[in-house]
């Protein structure tokens, strides 16, 4: 049996959706702030819903938007997914904005939710935040592939990599062909390098067959389709039963 953890992308900014994912027994949810207009006000109730259902929450932020790191971390979200990592400088940028000194230079405010609005011991808050917070660094292009060895060398302890197959396929001149042998081979190369270095790596798929393929490959975590896609497919299949 695979030990892969399975999560779903959340595009619909309603806490009930987060709770439903938790009730379904999935391992985590990924709130997508990159490909949706979701902002910090919409994120807050989603964070509360995830905590209520003891569901791990990942937030994917837009590319190189400094304020998003602060907004998400200050709401007490431990896992941030950063897209379009192509160079060591991109890794260093993500680390800088995700952690407090001495690891990074994240903006420090004690009067935020993550610090109990000023009621956590400040030294304990800083140390515990650095220990608890994690990064998921998203590789999704040929430039990132070309620099993968140096990127892996720069990955901080506790961070992981994620392979975005759709953007990777596009960068290879095969837009949308995420099962093309060249795309899969490129993904496998990253996976093998991560395994050698004992770095967790995840990927995305949008079919049950894809989940089976990558889970059998031993991928530590798989991000699947989206909440709305699941609903539409389930509703469509229901309609087919009465035709």
Model features per residue range: what roles?
Residues 29-30, 58, 81, 162, ...:
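Conserved beta-strand positions in the central sheet of alpha/beta enzyme cores
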Residues 40-74, 98-105, 127-131, 179-202, ...:
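Alpha-helix-loop-beta-strand connector modules within alpha/beta enzyme cores
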Residues 67, 79-156, 165-167:
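Conserved anion-binding
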Residues 46, 50, 88-104, 215, ...:
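C-terminal helical cap(s) of enzyme catalytic domains, especially alpha/beta-barrels
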Residues 19, 23, 59, 64-78, ...:
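Catalytic cores of alpha/beta
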Residues 79-93, 161-170, 219-238:
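Glycine-rich phosphate-binding active-site loops on the catalytic face of alpha/beta enzymes
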Residues 1-64, 96, 153-159:
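Conserved N-terminal beta1-alpha1 strand-loop-helix module at the mouth
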Residues 2-15, 58-60, 134-147, 200-206:
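Active-site mouth loops of central-metabolism enzymes
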């Amino acid at each position: 049996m695979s030990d892969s953890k399975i999560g779903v992308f959340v595009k619909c900014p309603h806490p009930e959706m987060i709770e439903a994912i938790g009730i379904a027994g999935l391992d985590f949810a990924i709130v997508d702030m990159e490909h949706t207009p979701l902002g910090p006000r919409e994120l807050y109730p989603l964070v509360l819903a995830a905590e209520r259902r003891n569901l791990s929450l990942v937030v994917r932020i837009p590319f190189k938007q400094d304020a998003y790191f602060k907004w998400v971390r200050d709401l007490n979200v431990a896992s941030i997914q950063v897209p379009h990592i192509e160079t060591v400088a991109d890794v260093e940028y993500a680390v800088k904005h995700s952690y407090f000194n001495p690891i990074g230079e994240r903006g420090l405010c004690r009067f935020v939710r993550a610090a109990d609005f000023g009621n956590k011991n400040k030294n304990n808050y800083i140390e515990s935040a650095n220990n608890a917070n994690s990064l998921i660094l998203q590789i999704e292009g040929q430039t990132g592939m070309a620099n993968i060895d140096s990127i892996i060398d720069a990955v901080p302890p506790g961070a992981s990599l994620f392979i975005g197959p759709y953007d990777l396929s596009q960068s290879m001149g095969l837009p949308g062909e995420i099962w093309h042998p060249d795309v899969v081979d490129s993904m496998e190369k990253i996976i093998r390098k991560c395994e050698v270095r004992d770095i967790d790596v995840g990927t995305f798929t949008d079919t049950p067959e894809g989940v089976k393929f990558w889970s059998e490959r031993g991928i530590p975590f798989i991000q699947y389709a989206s909440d709305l896609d699941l609903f539409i497919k389930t509703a469509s299949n229901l309609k087919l039963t009465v035709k």
